[in-house]
């Protein structure tokens, strides 16, 4: 997915109140913008870091700039939590994830469960309806290991329970972790930061929920799917090795 119009480079001054950040543009102008990420963003808020912003016009917008990318640990990392849904939908629609391919319809943000919305609903007259929950991942503590969540997420545990309900009802239920960085070659659930989520994850696996981890190639010009990676979890560590992304390279 290309960034159009092009992103604006800047230097991060501070991220605060979860939804706001201050930055210095290359012109020297200091701006305040919107941070579309409610997580802790551990390791991704260092003052002085090189960042990239999208720019939006509109009389109803309070802030013109949106925090999209940051340079951290020698790589470019996506922080906008809306991007993984778009990347996943694009990859599935193009047939780049073989096990989620061949569906005639890919719909986004459909009502289901307990007053929730499923990120992607895949339907086809000849196939089982598939519910896909997408989670944004950018947390890395160990080299090469992507982890989720980076803080306690009650909503995340609820989503796993609802996916389990769909599996119990005879549908396919999929948790797709989209990793907005290219320097990770494996994924695991971060149980030490959220034991409730880790427990819900194990329960979802036993109920038949499928789990995949898709890493992305991120640059200031575009975000593209770069391959499915193994999951460090008993019983599913090799799950993703069967499937390839056609755009991988």
Swiss-Prot record:
Q: Which Gene3D superfamilies match?
A: 2.40.50.580, 3.40.1350.60
GO MF annotation list: DNA binding
Which top-rank group of organisms is this from?
Bacteria
One of its Pfam families is SfsA_N
Family the entry assigns: Belongs to the SfsA family.
Q: Which NCBIfam families match?
A: sfsA
Cite the HAMAP family for this sequence. SfsA
Q: What is this protein called?
A: Sugar fermentation stimulation protein homolog
Q: Which organism is it from?
A: Rhizobium rhizogenes (strain K84 / ATCC BAA-868)
- The gene behind this protein is sfsA
